Structure formats: C-alpha cells, structure tokens
Curated annotation (Swiss-Prot):
Gene3D superfamilies: Dihydrodipicolinate Reductase, domain 2, NAD(P)-binding Rossmann-like Domain. It comes from Pseudomonas aeruginosa (strain ATCC 15692 / DSM 22644 / CIP 104116 / JCM 14847 / LMG 12228 / 1C / PRS 101 / PAO1). This is USG-1 protein homolog. GO terms for biological process: amino acid biosynthetic process. Belongs to the aspartate-semialdehyde dehydrogenase family. Pfam families: Semialdhyde_dh, Semialdhyde_dhC.
Length: 336
C-alpha cells in the first residue's frame, strides 16, 4: 500500500460512522491520523479508536486540506454542504449519503465496477452506494457474466436502522409501549411500525416512488448499466432493528441453469450461498458479518427463464460501512 494518509470520518457519531470507524481499526486501514467529525451538536464527544480516545470535531470549521481522504457518513445535507468544499481543498471524498448525483459522484464498488476509477482524477469525489444497491449488485455482478437478464424485480425489506439510531429507538419505544398495554402515538414513522409492515419507506413522489427506491434504481443502473434490463424496485419498512432482506427475480432470455447459478455464488468471495433445504436470515446469519448471504435459489413457478433469489446482509456494517472502507483501501493502494 501507499504511505498512510490523514483520514477524516464525517458523521462519526452515527450508526454507520461508528461502524466505519470500527472497521478502519479492525482492518488496520493505512492511516497516519484519524479525524472524527460531526455536527456542532455532537462535537466534543469522545470515541474509542485502537488504543486511544479521540475527540469529535465540528465539521463546519474543519480544514479539509489537512487530510487526504474523507468518508462522509452523515446526513445528505452535510454532504451537500461540505463534500465539494473538501474536494476543493485537495481531499478525496467517499460519500455514503446519496446526496450527490451519480454524474457528479459516480457510485463505485470494488467488486463490481472498480475500473470506473481509471476515468476519474484525484482528488476523487465518489459515492459508495446505499446498502440495498451494494448488496444486490455484489450478488448480481458475477451472475450477469452467465445470465442474459432482460428484467429485474426487487422487493427490499428494510430494517429501521436504515433511518439511523432514531429508527432503532422508535421501534424499541413502540414495542415497549405495546407490550405494556400503553396507548401508542407514532413519532418517526407515520404509523405503527412495531409488529407491522409499512408498504412504503418515507414519502413518495407524484409517480408513487420513495426517495430510497429512486436512489436504489439510480445506483444499480450506474453500477450495472444495461446488463440488467428494466429495473423495478419496491421498498418495505419492516419491524426489524438491523439488516436488509431482499427478494429478487431475474427474467432471463433463456431457461436458467440453476446449478451454474449456485456454482457462481459458491465461488464468489464475499458471498455465502446457503444450499438447498436451508435459507439465511438476518438475525441468524448476517448480523455482524462481512458477507452477503444468498439462499432460496429457484426457477419461476411457471417460467424456466426466471430465477429467484433471497439475499440478506447487515445493512450497517456490510452494506454501508465495509463497502466504503474497501473503496478507500483501493484508492490508497493504487490512486492516492
């Protein structure tokens, strides 16, 4: 690897930021000095890293010329306010918020489209895709080498941690209220989420699509291009604290060789294929792991040209934080 860099993590006190900081430590990320940053409300807190305790600084006053790489794991408005400022100061940026258009900050995954970096110039301004897009594309990228996909349908069951710590707190609060037979007044969500499924995640636009559905659509298209054909995305809010669960159907041009599909999955690094007669779950398999789990590989009930997949992953650690760290490692090794 290249010489260690000074690195900043913006949004270090959030759930994804905290996981990202932990992975930098676990993976011995090649950094010289780590700066933890957050909004003024969180500045002054202390967080552990390696053998030390680091003070969280205020992103509004931070001089990005003092670091070579910054991970933006904060809210979208923070990235809109500071990502371009960081790049103008000579700092390469990996944004996890989805705030920046793909034409401005192209989504990049090491296992999917790392070659995209060759057409970019330092200092880089890149997006690390949202957890669902990352989990889906990691599984599809190797399969598309053998499958001629004409259409892709995705239904994603999102945990409340997709909304950060506040989502986790709200599900815990609602669950406690209901179990204690107390009246429930929803706060973060527009209706009860505990012991319930919500048919949409957040507000929808004039066509009925939510912001996260639009983001997944744009990022998957940017990562996989025309290899998947038309894409349809539905996101459901599930009463689960952590982890994503995806039901995926690929419509292919020819009957699908299921044995070939499972061979590819079994041979791909970062993917754990759970064989026939079993299936993976978020709680039982994926939480805290660095792999994406795939099961229930089967043909369509009335169409041998369809293949169905069940995908589960830790959305905070694997889907968001690890993909960004892997991208940072690649940048330092070859480009910075």
């Amino acid at each position: 690897m290249s010489q260690p860099l000074n690195v900043a993590v913006v949004g270090a006190t959030g759930s994804v930021g905290e996981a990202l900081v932990g992975l930098l430590d676990e993976r011995d990320f090649p950094l010289h000095r780590l700066h933890l940053l957050a909004s003024a409300e969180s500045a002054g807190q202390r967080m552990g890293f390696a053998e030390s305790s680091l003070r969280v600084g205020d992103v509004d006053s931070f001089d990005f010329s003092s670091v070579g790489l910054a991970f933006f794991a904060a809210a979208a408005e923070v990235s809109r306010a500071h990502a371009e400022r960081a790049r103008a100061a000579g700092c390469s940026v990996i944004d996890l918020s989805g705030a920046l258009e793909p034409s401005v900050a192209p989504p990049v995954m090491v296992s999917v489209n790392a070659e995209r970096l060759a057409s970019q110039a330092a200092p880089f301004l890149l997006s690390s895709p949202c957890a669902v897009a990352a989990e889906l594309c990691e599984v599809l990228a190797p399969l598309l080498a053998t499958l001629d996909c004409r259409q892709l349908n995705l239904t994603a069951c999102l945990s409340v941690s997709s909304l950060g710590r506040e989502g986790v707190k709200e599900l815990a609060r609602q669950t406690a209220e209901l179990l204690n037979a107390r009246p429930l007044e929803p706060r973060l969500f527009d209706r009860q989420i505990a012991f319930n499924l919500l048919a949409q995640v957040g507000a929808v636009d004039a066509e009925g699509h939510s912001a996260i559905e639009r983001r997944i659509f744009a990022e998957v298209q940017a990562l996989l291009g025309e290899r998947i054909g038309p894409l349809n995305v539905t996101c459901i809010q599930a009463p689960v604290f952590f982890g994503d669960s995806l039901s995926v159907t690929l419509q292919c041009a020819e009957p699908v060789d299921l044995a070939a599909v499972t061979r590819v999955l079994d041979a791909t690094k970062g993917i754990e294929w759970v064989g026939e007669g079993d299936y993976p779950t978020v709680v039982g398999d994926a939480l805290g792991q660095d792999e994406t789990y795939v099961g229930r590989v089967r043909a369509g009930q009335a169409d041998p040209c369809q293949v169905n997949l069940w995908i589960v992953s830790d959305n905070v650690r694997k889907g968001a934080a690890l993909n960004a760290v892997l991208l940072g490692e690649l940048l330092i090794k070859h480009y910075l």
